[in-house]
UniProtKB/Swiss-Prot annotation:
Protein name: DNA repair protein RecO
PANTHER family with a match to the protein in the record: DNA REPAIR PROTEIN RECO
Family membership: Belongs to the RecO family.
Keywords per UniProt: DNA damage, DNA recombination, DNA repair
Organism: Lactococcus lactis subsp. cremoris (strain MG1363)
Originating gene: recO
GO biological process, one term: double-strand break repair
Keyword hit for DNA damage: yes
One Pfam assignment: RecO_N
Signal peptide: none
GO cellular component, as recorded: bacterial nucleoid
Disulfide-linked positions: none
Role: Involved in DNA repair and RecF pathway recombination.
Length: 251
């Protein structure tokens, strides 16, 4: 055990015994840790340990079991995420992806920062689907998946249009479409946007407008990539998928 200070982002909490809770926090300095909070309802930190909160932790870090919180300060609450069911669903999904992408206790300050920035953008009103797509694509390499959407897999031509081949795990230019008769037959703009999303920094992201039809094509393609190369099935993703028709109903 060791005492330490670190930034931490609450991923989720669950009941433990009658009055206690386990709170999973993605810390900047020590990776994802499970913290035991006794008598959670009476804890002075209860409001600071809700989902979608980030703060500075003073804690006892234990590599072999539960860690313990001594103090929480400088708390940031993502209020818009908590208040809007649609933003909440996207935020819950990317949190689940981050949780699945690395092992517990694994030091990964870059992923912590990427997740935090993604949640900030969602809370600020940036396009939910775009932020989620960017997160999905840029976290792929942590699942051991490296895909190049910027050039043809055969001739390395970098000017589109391109289509995607699962057979070759890469893009094909028109000259090489015949190499895979079962290529994806994508709208060329899908590959263009996928490549953009894979490379862009969230700090450079501007508010952009993408038509619903194109978003649906991108969603279908990314789902295909995850089915083929990652193979995880998250409850938060299933819930998000089930919300597709809610917007019209709730108008």
């Amino acid at each position: 055990m060791r005492d330490a200070e670190t930034q931490g982002l609450v991923l989720y909490s669950r009941n433990y015994k009658e009055k206690d809770k386990l709170v999973k926090i993605f810390t900047e300095s020590f990776g994802k840790r499970m913290f035991f909070v006794k008598n959670f309802g009476k804890s002075p930190y209860a409001s600071s340990l809700q989902a979608f909160t980030d703060g500075k932790l003073t804690a006892t870090i234990n590599d072999g079991g539960f860690s313990f919180i001594e103090d929480v300060s400088e708390v940031v609450v993502y209020k818009n995420i908590s208040a809007d069911i649609f933003i909440n669903a996207h935020a819950s999904y990317i949190i689940s992806l981050a949780d699945a992408a690395i092992s517990d206790n694994q030091y990964d300050p870059a992923l912590y920062g990427f997740l935090k920035r993604s949640l900030e953008l969602l809370d600020q009103g940036f396009d939910m689907e775009v932020v989620t797509n960017i997160f999905e694509l840029q976290v792929l390499h942590r699942f051991g998946v490296s895909l190049n959407f910027s050039e043809c897999a055969f001739c390395h031509k970098t000017v589109g249009p391109f289509d995607f081949s699962y057979k070759f795990s890469g893009c094909l230019c028109p000259r090489h479409f015949d190499e895979d008769l079962r290529r994806s037959h994508l709208d060329p703009n899908v590959i263009y946007l996928i490549n953009l999303f894979q490379e862009i920094s969230l700090d450079e992201l501007k508010k952009i407008s993408i038509k619903a039809e194109m978003k649906a094509k991108i969603r279908q393609f990314i789902d295909g990539l995850y089915d083929e190369y990652v193979g995880i099935h998250l409850k938060s993703k299933k819930f998000l998928d089930g919300m597709s028709g809610w917007a019209d109903i709730m108008k």
